[in-house]
């Protein structure tokens, strides 16, 4: 997805700053709703990804880059931005952060057992990284940001049945989850287009912009929401492989297992809430305006392997 057009002079400047060959061709890359991504082909045959951050400030991006260095150093495969002149990993252009990333030549995660198991292993490895004190605790894809939707609906008089249901669910949340669930570094948005895999192996985990300190098991159910369904149908084998890989590195506690149904419920609602905000409150009048309903409809489907049973609401 591209929101910001590439200025050839700026592209040439960042390539020069990274010590790269001149630009030969540029092509927009699909995927992502918060930034613009381009594939750059250089005159020496090298390929790089140019990422332009449309919704994050340069200060936020700079912090994220330090997170990526830490995560990659612990064996989680993720592209780290190239170093530029002066030691920075980004260039500020018209108030936006631009950065160059290594190009990983692999397709999106297909959902085969081996890849799902490997993804589970990598998630557990991520969850085992010690917090260095620089990660935020607000989960921008979770329930933490629901109050912002309510404030906007109140200010603009745009309340809807869906938002009212979210409001009611948020009030119930503290009584539904056990206290003291293990917390740590989570990715927060592990959907298939954020995972590159081939030959049964994850080659790269992408887009850590929602990385934060949160409930670890919530990351596991989000990965199932994003990678464990096929044509609107939950695939039990994908969950089994994901969990098997995860627990080969880190065992879930009994409290975490017991919390999985509620974590799944609220994670699914959170994805729906993100889509509602994006396509009903920010980018309106598109073919995606009802996309949030694809998530709420999933809540009507029982998942015995997760211990989840539908309870109605949020429709």
Give, region by region, the residue ranges found by the protein language model:
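Conserved NTP-binding catalytic cores of kinases and kinase-like/nucleotidyltransferase enzymes
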Residues: 1-83, 198-201, 306-315
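Active-site acidic catalytic loop and adjacent metal/ATP-binding pocket
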Residues: 30, 35-42, 49-50, 81, ...
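ATP-binding pocket architecture of kinase catalytic cores
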Residues: 43-135
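A glycine-centered beta->alpha junction motif in the catalytic cores
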Residues: 97-111, 147, 151-152, 269-285
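A cross-family kinase active-site recognition segment
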Residues: 110-161, 181-183, 213, 289
């Amino acid at each position: 997805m591209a929101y910001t057009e590439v200025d050839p002079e700026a592209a040439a400047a960042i390539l020069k700053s990274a010590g790269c060959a001149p630009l030969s061709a540029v092509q927009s890359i699909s995927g992502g709703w918060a930034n613009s991504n381009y594939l750059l082909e250089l005159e020496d045959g090298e390929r790089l990804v140019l990422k332009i951050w449309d919704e994050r400030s340069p200060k936020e991006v700079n912090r994220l880059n330090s997170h990526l260095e830490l995560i990659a150093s612990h064996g989680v495969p993720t592209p780290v931005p190239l170093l530029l002149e002066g030691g920075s990993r980004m260039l500020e252009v018209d108030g936006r952060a631009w950065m160059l990333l290594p190009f990983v030549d692999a397709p999106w995660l297909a959902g085969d057992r081996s890849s799902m198991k490997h993804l589970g292993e990598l998630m557990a490895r991520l969850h085992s990284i010690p917090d260095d004190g620089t990660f935020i605790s607000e989960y921008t894809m979770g329930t933490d940001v629901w109050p912002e939707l309510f404030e906007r609906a109140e200010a603009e008089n745009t309340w809807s049945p869906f938002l009212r249901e979210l409001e009611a669910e948020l009030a119930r949340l503290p009584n539904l989850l056990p206290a003291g669930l293990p917390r740590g570094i989570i990715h927060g948005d592990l959907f298939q287009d954020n995972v590159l895999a081939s030959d049964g192996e994850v080659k790269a985990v992408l887009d850590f912009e929602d990385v934060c300190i949160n409930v670890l098991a919530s990351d596991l159910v989000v990965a199932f929401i994003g990678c464990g369904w096929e044509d609107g149908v939950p695939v039990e084998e994908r969950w089994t492989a994901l969990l098997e890989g995860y627990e080969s590195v880190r065992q879930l506690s009994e409290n975490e297992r017991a919390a999985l149904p509620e974590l799944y419920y609220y994670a699914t609602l959170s994805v729906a809430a993100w889509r509602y905000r994006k396509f009903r409150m920010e980018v309106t009048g598109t073919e995606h305006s009802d996309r949030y309903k694809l998530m709420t409809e999933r809540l009507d489907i029982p998942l015995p392997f997760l211990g989840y049973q539908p309870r109605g609401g949020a429709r």
